Regions:
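Secreted, disulfide-rich extracellular signaling modules
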Residues: 2-550
Length: 550
């Protein structure tokens, strides 16, 4: 709760500062339109030094994410990562009535994949928008026996229980695999998601034929009863678990239910250590469910006589409770040693290793001291003069942006299209993110002005070079015009730059939190740092400014 209150306070303060800066910026923009091109003013540009160094992303809060990863992903640079998850399930209806002479028909688990649809000439095709890798994995589904409690008994009243990506709780307790892996419900030794939609059929008694009545987007949809090919549970399991409990208090209310049936555990394992895939599941979809289908006897009166007919019923559960992702990494030891080496923090690293999930990130310090001894204050004084608390602008910033070049010989081929830069000291986005209203703030296809997608430039010899560009004009104006703190910035990979909700780190020492978009991708990229042996590709803070000709 303290963490949340802190973030809310920081956000409120940030918005206040942003509003003031924006007002000033509008005024300066109007001034700029009058001075550009006049003989008394000219636009110049200069690259200012920055310092960059690596940091490890330690275990983070992984419960109730916007999405849930599942699978195994092998990164040829970093190594392998397995991501499993455990999720609570609750019924849509408590105190169910199953009827008399109940007979189990089927049990079906459905979880949609995160996908995009396109239609051409009445034909709809799908693309999984968060599928990483192209090889099958081993996939198991278990009945979970570990209680995912809602509240932390060691915290203040109503303090939420935090669960972390290494399978631990805030108290330090570990989620034991023996509790997660109770009854095996499903096992596939070679699983890979299908891009095909799923047609649901219903039997039409009049036509005496099955008809398509509904179509689902591509989904993980499996039978968990009487399915010997995938090791479904023994006869009587589902009847004993639910259908025989009609008048039992354990399924009559939420608290008793989540203690009785503690959800499902999805375990992903590699078939080989160098192949696999990872995908994002949409557990918040209305279609994400476990449905127990059954028949029961219903007595009806026809022409004054009672008749018994067989009626179909269903008992549906959804993933409405806690959902926890658990990561298991097998990273290259030499890469980890480089990332964990803090001796380079003072001067900066040669290469920056960015990896999603429980991976790594980099810290950015603007206006770092150069070899001539110029300090942050020296650089800022080029743009302003402060006298008696009053700030006089010497140079008007027209545009400011960071450039990071990809180290293409070290990076793998599957690099992300976007990187995300945020205020590391306050664990919030920078002002430029707020003012960039391109598309939708919640969309992965947004913030193109601030966070420019991966681009390619061609040099004079025809050689292509990949780079990322991040605009920080508003952020720099805040520092110069409002004397705001020149905070440290963090740079991370992201599956969705619209997913900026912070996930608190378990060991929040230097890094307090990371955005959820970083959690939800296994991708990586290696960038040139400020001590790169290729000086032309070292990251730069480029500032275009207008100043009077004296």
């Amino acid at each position: 709760m303290k963490f949340i209150n802190s973030i809310l306070l920081k956000c409120t303060c940030a918005f206040s500062v942003i509003a003031m800066i924006h007002s000033c910026d509008n005024e300066f923009s109007e001034i700029g339109t009058g001075i550009v091109g006049t003989p008394d003013f000219e636009i110049q540009n200069r690259a200012y030094p920055i310092k960059t160094y690596n940091k490890r992303i330690t275990p983070f809060e992984s419960n109730k994410l916007e999405g849930n990863l599942l699978g195994f992903y092998h990164d040829p640079v970093f190594g392998g990562s397995s991501v499993s998850f455990v999720g609570q399930m609750t019924p849509r209806d408590y105190n169910p009535t199953f009827g008399t002479n109940t007979v189990l028909d089927s049990v079906i688990l459905t979880i949609p994949y995160s996908s995009n649809a396109s239609t051409l000439e009445d034909v709809t095709t799908f693309e999984l928008d968060s599928l990483y890798g192209s090889s099958p994995i081993k996939l198991s589904v278990f009945k979970n026996d570990f209680l995912l409690r809602k509240y932390d008994p060691s915290a203040a009243i109503d303090g939420a229980q935090n669960y972390y990506s290494d399978g631990s709780l805030s108290s330090g307790q570990l989620i034991e695999s023996s509790a997660l892996e109770s009854q095996l419900l499903y096992y596939n030794s070679s699983y890979f998601p299908s891009l095909e939609s799923i047609e649901l059929e219903t039997y039409n008694e009049e036509s005496e034929a099955f008809e398509v009545t509904n179509t689902l987007n591509p989904s993980f949809r499996v039978h968990l009863h009487n399915n010997s090919d995938f090791l479904s549970p023994p006869e009587g399991f589902w009847e004993d678990l639910f259908l025989s409990r009609e008048e039992d208090a354990v399924i009559g209310a939420e608290d008793s239910f989540i203690n009785y049936f503690r959800g499902l555990y999805f375990k992903a394992e590699p078939i080989t250590e160098t192949e696999g895939h990872m995908m994002q599941l949409d557990l918040l979809s209305n279609e994400a469910s476990l449905v127990v289908y059954y028949t029961y006897d219903q007595i009806i009166t026809v022409d004054g006589e009672e008749e018994t007919s067989t009626v179909q019923g269903n008992y549906e559960l959804t993933f409405s409770g806690n959902r926890v992702n658990i990561f298991e990494n097998n990273f290259d030891p030499s890469i980890l040693q480089t990332i964990n080496d803090t001796s380079t923090d003072l001067e900066g690293d040669d290469y920056l290793y960015l990896k999603g999930g429980e991976g790594s990130m980099a810290v950015i310090e603007l206006f770092s001291e150069d070899e001539l001894g110029n300090s942050e204050e020296d650089y800022l004084n080029e743009f302003r003069e402060i006298d008696g608390g009053q700030t006089t602008v010497r140079r008007l910033i027209n545009e400011a942006f960071l450039e990071f070049y990809v180290e293409e010989t070290l990076s793998n081929s599957d690099i992300p299209n976007r990187v995300y830069v945020y205020d590391l000291d306050n664990n919030i986005y920078v002002a430029d993110y707020f003012f960039d209203q391109t598309v939708n703030t919640a969309s992965a296809d947004s913030k193109y002005t601030h966070l420019v997608p991966l681009s390619t430039e061609t040099d004079s010899e025809g050689v292509q070079h990949k780079k990322y560009k991040v605009r920080l004009t508003e952020h720099l104006n805040s520092i110069i015009l409002k004397d705001s703190t020149n905070v440290k910035l963090g740079i991370v990979v992201s599956s969705n730059v619209g997913a900026v909700n912070s996930r608190k780190l378990k060991d929040a020492n230097e890094i307090e939190g990371i955005p959820s978009g970083t959690v939800l991708t296994p991708r990586s990229v290696i960038l040139h740092g400020n001590n790169s042996p290729n000086s032309a590709k070292r990251p730069k803070l480029n500032i275009y400014y207008t100043e009077p000709n004296n």
